Amino acid sequence: MEDVSESDNNVETSIIHLPDDCLSFIFQRLDSVADHDSFGLTCHRWLNIQNISRRSLQFQCSFSVLNPSSLSQTNPDVSSHHLHRLLTRFQWLEHLSLSGCTVLNDSSLDSLRYPGARLHTLYLDCCFGISDDGISTIASFCPNLSVVSLYRCNISDIGLETLARASLSLKCVNLSYCPLVSDFGIKALSQACLQLESVKISNCKSITGVGFSGCSPTLGYVDADSCQLEPKGITGIISGGGIEFLNISGVSCYIRKDGLVPIGSGIASKLRILNLRMCRTVGDESIEAIAKGCPLLQEWNLALCHEVKISGWEAVGKWCRNLKKLHVNRCRNLCDQGLLALRCGCMNLQILYMNGNARLTPTAIEMFRLHRADITLRTEEMMVIGPDWRLYAQE
């Protein structure tokens, strides 16, 4: 019989001998930035695995952290040269945030050619040097974007149309504080991107809303806080029939007492969250129509809606059977009789935000507490309600 020595049976093994796919699996499950960096410092092979495994990148100057492990340990001033070095190294990125990188300009985005079509999410918040030329570069290199944030960028209708035509799979778009974007750009976006789910256009003073007319039924989230919306624009926003979240707080004076009646016409029957805060001119006609026509409504912000009177509050109490949260802070015309209507109705109400209502007596409030112990009364005034625009598509 052949004598096999013990040394012949012992095969030297260690983590170094693992195949690349196993090492990549290990890297993806490291939690901390320090562990990621240490992994790449082991050897050239592991550094390459780190490079091709990284899917997300952002910088310390970013306003929100998508993933702590994606933070780059660098100084806040990200230059074009620095960005080029990083994107040539991490060419498999799917999520990139350049938010707060204020020194970048249009030519800086040429480096996007490296992640290119793999990139799905791009944040350019407060990149003041990015204009339509930079957006054209994005459109050329990144056709598969689904989430784009251009908050406070110098983009116009031309750039938005270019992006919309190139990135047909766009689902979530943030155009807040983009003063050069008007209804023409919104029309291009809503007609080209048929998978659009959420759009944020807060403080875009050139948008009236008519550009949304004929939008896709997938559009379920629109944040139009402090826009110059018109009645036809409101109708346009809900025209797709899929709207679930609508924020038109601080709506322009063009909306009269009956200006929001179309919301209750049945087109917005899926509406669950409605923010009408500071819609001071909206009256009972609109409130009654919405209360009847939006049976799924779960949260409604009517803070500072001074023209809502007794018949409006009675409609809310009678028809809003699924309402869980109601905001009535500083409503001048919420009186004891209106509060009684809310007390006798809204049987699923859980939280009532209420303070600064001068016409309410302490007795009426105490009676409300006594008869509706199931409702929590809160005095704080909520400026923002509902889900974040980025998270809506993930729900």
UniProtKB/Swiss-Prot annotation:
| This protein's record includes keyword Ribosomal protein | no
Q: Matching SUPFAM superfamilies, A to Z?
A: F-box domain (SSF81383), RNI-like (SSF52047)
- Pfam families assigned to the protein according to its UniProt record, in alphabetical order: LRR_6
- Gene3D superfamilies to which the protein is assigned, alphabetical: Ribonuclease Inhibitor
From the UniProt record, list the LRR repeat ranges: 75-100, 101-126, 127-152, 154-177, 178-203, 226-250, 252-278, 279-304, 305-330, 331-356
**Residue ranges of every copy of the F-box domain listed in the record:** 13-61
Q: Which CDD domains match?
A: F-box_AtTIR1-like
Listed PANTHER family? PARTNER OF PAIRED, ISOFORM B-RELATED
Name assigned to this protein: F-box/LRR-repeat protein 12
Tell me which species this is from: Arabidopsis thaliana (Mouse-ear cress)
User: What lineage does UniProt assign to this protein's organism?
Assistant: Eukaryota, Viridiplantae, Streptophyta, Embryophyta, Tracheophyta
